[in-house]
Amino acid sequence: MTARCGHLAPIDENDRSGLFSDWNTTRIQVYVGTCQLLLGQPQRAITTLNNALSLADMDSPNVALAARVDLASAYSLSGELEEGCHVLGETYQALATMGNHRGLERAQRAIERIAPWQNERPVLALMERVRSINA
């Protein structure tokens, strides 16, 4: 987590009201990782998102799956296309199984990010897997 975000870590029950009632340190860390990804810092996003996914207070399956979609994008954009496609395929399967339409939309955007490598073996395998899941 970045130095600026470190002061957000001590969240107590008084802070959990209204719009941010379901936010905890882990969810904030996922948000930071997503921002790093979108700011073109995939290596930093990989570290941040992996850390978030390993924390004990990762109590929301939806947040974990969103983190895994963004982690897959970060792997792919950092040159680890095979790992990115593997993580995205596994996550897409989980999202489809639970009927998480917002998560599937997020995964579709991740697939769009890897379009420049559409003829590479890992991407072709991912696309075949997605087609079979959607069939």
Task: Show the residue positions of the predicted features.
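Conserved binding/catalytic microenvironments
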Residues: M1-A135
